[in-house]
């Protein structure tokens, strides 16, 4: 089972994400990664860092990155579709790299969705089922310019179980989450808001948590 964690607030996001991911290593994993919101205005973008193996390897790589990002999402993966590799590790991104997503669950109709999306010009980088979500959200965002509305629209096309969190470089400080037959909790602490697939990931940050359905979490 995959692990999801997210944070938006005033603290350094990478430290919080790594702590949460390490707490969820008991769920099993073959790779891990984070997406961090970096820059402001026209310079805003997402930094995506992924590693195969233990979260400690990701932590080591992040320790060499001077990042003051205060919003991001992270993931530990247990492979279901696609072999363990950096390319198949989460987060997955849209074609333009402005949207990133982490997901726990199985998308039953991913092959059909992938074929349709590729037919509309989307380029897939991984073997995973999760990546279809990134492209579905990207398509919807081109129309809505609203991350949460785009996540809702993407979910209408998916058959299967999912818990997901998404960020967009054009909506700083916002994490959109949705779930169906897969756990996601949202917590509020003194310095920000948190998202996780397991409450144990948030135990150091807050005890004020609720089960999520579909919502946007902001600072």
Segments predicted by a language model, with ranges:
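Conserved short alpha-helical segments that host acidic/polar catalytic motifs at enzyme active sites
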Residues: 1-216
């Amino acid at each position: 089972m995959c692990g999801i964690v997210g944070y938006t607030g005033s603290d350094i996001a990478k430290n919080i994400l790594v702590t949460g991911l390490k707490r969820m290593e008991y769920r099993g994993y073959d790779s891990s990664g984070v997406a961090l919101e970096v820059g402001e205005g026209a310079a805003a973008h997402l930094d995506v860092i992924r590693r195969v193996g233990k979260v400690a390897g990701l932590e080591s790589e992040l320790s060499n990155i001077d990042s003051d990002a205060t919003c991001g999402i992270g993931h530990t993966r247990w492979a279901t579709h696609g072999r363990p590799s950096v390319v198949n590790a989460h987060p997955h991104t849209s074609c333009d790299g402005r949207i990133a997503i982490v997901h726990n669950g199985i998308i039953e109709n991913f092959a059909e969705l992938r074929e349709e999306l590729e037919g509309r010009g989307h380029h897939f980088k991984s073997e995973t089922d999760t990546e279809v979500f990134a492209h579905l959200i990207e398509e919807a965002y081109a129309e809505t310019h609203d991350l949460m509305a785009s996540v809702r629209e993407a979910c209408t096309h998916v058959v299967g179980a999912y818990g997901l969190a998404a960020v967009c470089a054009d909506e700083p400080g916002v994490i959109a989450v949705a779930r169906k037959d897969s756990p996601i909790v949202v917590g509020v602490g003194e310095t920000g808001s948190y998202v996780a697939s397991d409450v144990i990931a948030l135990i150091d940050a807050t005890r004020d948590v609720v089960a999520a359905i579909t919502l946007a979490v902001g600072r």
